């Protein structure tokens, strides 16, 4: 049995509720995989990071993977900010569409049109603890548990797992979600927001859209089946 949580996107209160549902179902310290995107859009990215760091430091059975938003955050905090080449031209991490502005706000850094980009960057580097940067930058990209393969975005169909690139593992979308190939294991991922976590035969999408205000719904995998965890208990996630 293993639990999983999709994209959190700064929703600390939702994360607390999801963890409470997991504890109610599985006890004090069951294995939990987080598939990335802890920052951006929601109101408390800092709080989410601190909660994850505290859990890992306390020895909880948590596997915390890295997502594309987590990488964008750490890249922005380099000596010279790096923009991810997967972004569309003219769209920066600080744009509200991506939500970097709310991440910096959780550290007390205001992103406004009246401020110079260099001043925002300098204040951000001073405000964000190096421990937070290191924690996100050092997260693994994948986790294998039996016939479950956990990853942030997905995999490149037809490419052996050891040859998958970091960019695909945290950024791939249409080439993965539109492919019905049997990958030889169930790919459990986030990244592509849906209305709720959904089983699609060859993959299980955990991203129920918490970054857009929808609930953060944890999932439990046990004996080849999957269930959503709700206040009423387990709800079977049938393949669609």
Predicted regions and their residues:
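Active-site neighborhood of divalent metal-dependent phosphoester bond hydrolases
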Residues: 28, 45-138, 176
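Well-ordered alpha/beta subsegment
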Residues: 238-240
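Acidic, His/Gly-enriched loop-helix segments that form or flank divalent-metal centers
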Residues: 98, 104-205, 209-215, 221-236
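N-terminal active-site segment of His-dependent metallophosphoesterases
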Residues: 1-51
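A general structural motif
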Residues: 27-30, 59-61, 146, 184
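Active-site environment of divalent metal-dependent phosphoester hydrolases
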Residues: 9-13, 40-43, 69-74, 157-158, ...
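Short, glycine/charged-enriched secondary-structure capping and boundary segments
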Residues: 17-20, 47-50, 78-81, 164-165, ...
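Residue-level marker for buried hydrophobic side chains located in beta-strands
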Residues: 4, 32-34, 64-65, 149, ...
